[in-house]
Each structure stands twice: as C-alpha cells, then as structure tokens.
C-alpha cells in the first residue's frame, strides 16, 4: 500500500492532460448527506478554497521519453496526491475531510459530485499587461465577449444570450445546448 492518499478521478471533455501536472489544485462541488428523513437528504455546496491536491509529474529520469510524446493514463499517471498516510490514517481519509468541511460525521455522507480545479489566479501578462493568463480562457472569454456585446448594444427588441454547459462532450447532457431546455 502506498504511503500517500490518492484521489481517483474521471476526466471530463477535451482535457489537456499535461496542463494539470504540478499545479496546486482545490476541490469544489456538491455533497449529499443524510437529512431529517430518507426522502429529504441535505445538499451542501463545498469549496476547499485552498490547495489540497497536486498531480505530480515524474522526474525526467523516471520517464526519459516524456519530451517525445506526452501520453498520460488518467487512472495510473494522473491520480491527485492529497495526503501522506500514517498508521492512524484510514482508507476513508477523503470522506473525513468532506465531513469536516460540511461540519458533519463522515458516515452521514450519501454521495458527492466534486471537481478539481487549478487554484492559480488569473493574471495580466506582457510588458504592457496586454495578455491574460488563466485557466478556461476559451469559455470565459466567449462569455465575457457575449456579455459586453449585450451590455453595449441598443436593440429595438429583446436581446439575449444562451450559455450552456458540456460543449466539450457534444452538448448532449441535460444542461447542454442539445438538450430540451430550449425547443
């Protein structure tokens, strides 16, 4: 058994895998816990808001061909490192952490849907701050451009923008553009 606690993950969409290596990562999402009855569970939106994980990249002497082809298996090469394990750490260390952030006992957790995210703040880059460095620029810049266009236009009728999730996987989810939200 390895002496560290790892988190099993599932990749979503068109992931640029090497971009997630050696970055401080945090965890946010929804935790479902026991409620007043079996038919009324509680929902908690959580965000650790601090670096709690990293996906370490092996040193060059451990992978001599890394510069020739950056091929990473998500289930074996990209498991986020969360903690060092000692004799007192149990296998459910992550459930304990979720229980702590929700202020409940770990046994009350029924389910969770969580996401890792890079904890690096966006910044201006360049001699004249003419560039923006940030994660998810493809989505954020599109939303920003749409919002600015909507704010500065002077339409005679109704103007709106539609922003959907899941375009990376074909928009065919319940909240995607190909869903039944808009006929």
Map each language-model feature to its residues.
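N-terminal hydrophobic/helix-forming segments and targeting peptides
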Residues: 1-183
